[in-house]
Swiss-Prot record:
Positions annotated to bind a 1,2-diacyl-sn-glycero-3-phosphate: 331, 520, 659
Residues involved in Ca(2+) binding: 186, 370, 404, 720
An annotated Gene Ontology molecular function: calcium ion binding
Protein name (database record): Phospholipase D alpha 1
Comment block on domains: C2 domain is a calcium-binding fold, and the binding promotes the protein association with membranes. A lower affinity toward calcium can be anticipated for PLD alpha due to the absence of two potential calcium ligands.
Length: 808
């Protein structure tokens, strides 16, 4: 049966199986289980029956496990499923769970074509065995399905029409009104970074300074400071700009937190416990997160610092639990404090929260100039970060690895949602309860309420999203019914919040003109990859974001409208670029790009167009090249002869590491958080993540382009990356804009990769160094198999030994 595109939303209810065996005799499953139990020695177990929902081989839903009903399991569970898949069947698989996996009981097939008219289908479907024959008992499963094509969504391709837009549906946290948002590019913005960007109402964009604001927020706290991080390093100062010093600004972060705790402020920290940081690996661990060092620093102090492993929820098998606890991380990066009111003069306090991609650790402090060598005797002398070359050190000199990132501050009712997220996590994994009893602060702490008036032109509507499950958050509902009401996804005895992926999907589907993405990773939708040299079913990077992007572009091409997606990623994932894990991720990235370009090329050909596909989807990376200055820091040692480190030092160049996790849609809506565009971050049951989605209701792209703070922030980012502003950048959906950006990035790549350059690179935005054929194939650029100063293939290489779950 031919496959058809299901692009929209599936509503599915799985009711029950009528009978799994005939009469009272043993079924095939019973014999299988007896054999397994005897072989592995787990003893006789209780049948735990569950059902899965697949679009062909892509898992899109899973029920809870039903115990002690081996004959007639009844789930009565409903699912809200976003889909962007080509499929001929929706497959319902019935399984019995066991300690090392699951035993197949049978499959039922629902032809997709029966759903395309949008009518509700309620039926019993015959269950087939492994050989596609009816089961001996003639078992059937009762399901109800209804498909809503994406074009039936009232928000499809319409942007945010009014300030009454209610936010992303089916989520744990509702959208909050009357908020304030501050957006940060990099950890710091120096005074001489002043792009003149016009906003609505005759105003101009003003940058904010992330680590200065976090320093002020921590310093001002009187009652609580709550921090979560992938890494928190005590030995860093937050204030480093000699032109913007603050009283007490030279204090290190660890000492600042100790000082606040000594003042009576409740300081509680959840830092990811890198389980590789044991002696066999060295104390820093494979990830060098300083987790043990941070814990030891706060031992026997009033700071409550908990090393927090990524524990599995209780629903997985032994094998699944092992994967979660050893492969995945806590990746949320938040700070929550009580803070004075904006104009002071009151004993009242409010909640203020920070959410984004920047950990409070070494290697993160940087500015829009992203120096390689010039700050090695100042801001980066004691914070030299270069993990891409073995043995790199300040003694051996630059280039350091510059760090580009994005963060946000939220105020108003949304800040309380970030606080609640911390409380949920602490109550699950924080040990003894040291959380401040907020009821005791009723007279001091202003409850969740708007911080702007309804007619304030600068107000924001903001919604909090997460990737997290019941293994990391306390108080998730126990039943699928309650989980569904709370906007959560129920799995195999696991309750999951997967709303970050939902937020991206909804924003892409709403988009009208353009999308701008910066992300540390870009891979996924593996169900749509070419399968000529891999088994795509084993990859499991099933999140929809890349496919949603390409389908949006395809739809616009079909309608004769222009739509452009700009994506900025790092040259390679941080680490030694020749290593197997880095090469594997680059391979997944190439396959993702190729899948998207194939979609675009097919759509162009169907319309008889011979356009360059890079006019619709274009990938960039960031890099810098710095001429030697007199009086520059001189290293006392030299890198290894003929090493990539030495070549990069001699050529005065290196990538700027893109660690951002951000998407801007039509200059009216922005997502900022900790989540990468990969399966680890978007799954919900892998890495824990947090993000916020926000817009200004008085600055929407309705009749005229949006010219609020989201627009100003994008323009400031482009000024940072390109070193200039151009009138065409005001309208990224126009061909003039994408051609200008591509032309400048191509030129900067040529300068970056050239043998000699005796001046600073004029801009940081570089073409991602791959070619795109008119057939959509991703190829090497002529003479550019490897990244400069490395022997690492740009197109990557599939790994024969690393499991995909680790690198996707």
């Amino acid at each position: 049966m031919s496959k058809v595109l299901l692009h929209g939303t599936l509503h599915v209810t799985v009711y029950e199986v009528d009978k799994l065996r005939e009469g009272g005799g043993p079924n095939v499953f019973g014999k299988l289980m007896a054999n397994i139990q005897e072989t592995v020695g787990f003893g006789e177990g209780t049948p735990k029956i569950y059902a899965t929902i697949d679009l062909e081989k892509s898992r899109v839903g899973r029920t809870r496990m039903i115990e002690n009903e081996p004959q007639n399991p009844r789930w009565y569970e409903s699912f809200h499923i976003y889909c962007a898949h080509h499929a001929s069947n929706i497959i319902f698989t019935v399984k019995d769970d066991n300690p090392i996996g699951a035993t197949l009981l049978g499959r039922a097939y629902m032809p997709v074509r029966e759903l395309l008219d949008g009518d509700e289908v309620d039926k019993w479907i015959e269950i087939m065995d492994e050989d596609n024959n009816p089961t001996p008992a003639g078992s059937k499963i009762h399901v109800k399905l209804q498909y809503f094509d994406v074009t039936q969504d009232r928000n499809w391709d319409r942007g945010i029409k009014t300030g009454k837009y209610p936010g992303v549906p089916y989520t744990f946290f509702a959208q909050r009104q009357g908020c304030r948002v501050s957006l940060y590019q990099d950890a710091h913005v120096p005074d001489n970074f002043i792009p003149k960007i016009s906003l609505a109402g005759g105003k101009y964009y003003e940058p904010h300074r992330c680590w200065e604001d976090i320093f002020d927020a921590i310093s001002d706290a009187k009652h609580f400071i709550y921090i979560t991080g992938w890494s928190v390093y005590t030995q860093i100062p937050l204030i480093r700009d000699p032109n913007r010093q603050k009283p007490g600004g030279d204090v290190l972060l660890g000492q600042l937190l100790k000082k606040k705790a000594d003042e009576g402020v409740r300081v509680a920290m959840l830092v990811w416990d890198d389980r590789t940081s044991v002696n066999v690996f060295k104390e820093d661990g494979l990830m060098a997160t300083h987790d043990e060092e941070t814990e030891n620093f706060f031992k026997d102090t009033d700071v409550h610092c908990i090393l927090c492993p990524r524990d599995p929820d209780d629903g997985g098998s032994i094998i699944q639990d092992l994967k979660v606890s050893t492969m995945f991380t806590h990746h949320q990066k938040i700070v929550v404090v009580d803070h004075e009111l904006p104009r002071g003069g009151s004993q009242k306090r409010r909640v203020m929260s920070f959410v984004g991609g920047i950990d409070l650790c070494d290697g993160r402090y940087d500015s829009a100039f992203h120096p390689l060598f010039s700050t090695l005797d100042s801001a980066h002398h004691d914070d030299f970060h270069q993990p891409n070359y073995a043995g790199a050190s300040i003694a051996k000199g630059g280039p350091r690895e510059p760090w580009h990132d994005i963060h946000s501050r939220v105020e108003g009712p949304i800040a309380w949602d970030v606080l609640f997220n911390f409380e949920q996590r602490w109550r699950k994994q924080g040990g003894k309860n040291v959380l401040v009893d907020l009821k005791q602060l009723d007279d001091i702490l202003i409850p969740p309420s708007p911080v702007t008036f309804p007619n304030d032109q600068e107000t924001w509507n903001v919604q909090l999203f997460r990737s997290i499950d019941g293994g990391a958050a306390f108080g998730f509902p126990d039943t699928p019914e309650e989980a569904s009401k709370s906007g959560l996804v129920s799995g195999k005895d696991n309750i999951i919040d997967r709303s970050i992926q939902d937020a991206y999907i909804n924003a892409i589907r709403r988009a009208k003109h353009f999308i701008y993405i910066e992300n540390q990773y870009f891979l996924g939708s593996s169900f749509a990859w070419k399968s000529d040299d891999i088994d795509v079913d084993e990859v499991g990077a099933l999140h929809l974001i890349p496919k949603e992007l390409s389908l949006k572009i395809v739809t616009k091409i079909q309608e004769g409208e222009k739509f452009i997606v700009y994506i900025v990623v790092p040259m390679w994932p941080e680490g030694i670029p020749e290593n197997g894990s880095v090469q594997a991720i680059l391979d997944w990235q190439r396959r993702t790009m190729e899948m998207m370009y194939k979609d675009i090329v097919d759509a162009l050909q169907d319309k008889g167009l011979d356009d360059d596909p890079r006019e619709y989807l274009t990938f960039f990376c960031l890099g810098n090249r710095e001429a030697k200055k007199s009086g520059e820091y001189e290293p006392t040692e030299a890198p290894e002869p003929d090493s990539g480190y030495l070549h990069a030092q001699e050529n005065r160049r290196f990538m700027i590491y893109v660690h951002s996790k951000m998407m801007i849609v039509d200059d009216e809506y922005i997502i900022v958080g900790s989540a990468n565009i990969n399966q680890r971050s978007m799954d919900g049951a892998r890495d824990s993540e947090i993000a916020m989605g926000a817009y200004q209701p008085y600055h929407l792209a309705t009749q005229t382009p949006a010219r609020g703070h989201v627009h100003g922030f994008r323009m400031a980012l482009w000024y940072e990356h390109l070193g200039m502003l151009d009138d065409s950048f005001e309208r990224p959906e126009n061909k003039d804009c994408v051609n200008k950006a591509n032309e400048m990035a191509d030129k900067c790549w040529d300068l970056y990769a050239s043998e000699d350059l005796d001046r600073d690179l004029p801009g940081h935005l570089l073409r991602y160094p791959v070619g795109v054929t008119r057939k959509g194939d991703i190829t090497e650029l002529p003479g550019t198999e490897c990244f400069p100063d490395t022997s690492a293939r740009i197109l990557g290489a599939k790994s024969d030994y690393l499991p995909p779950i680790l690198t996707t």
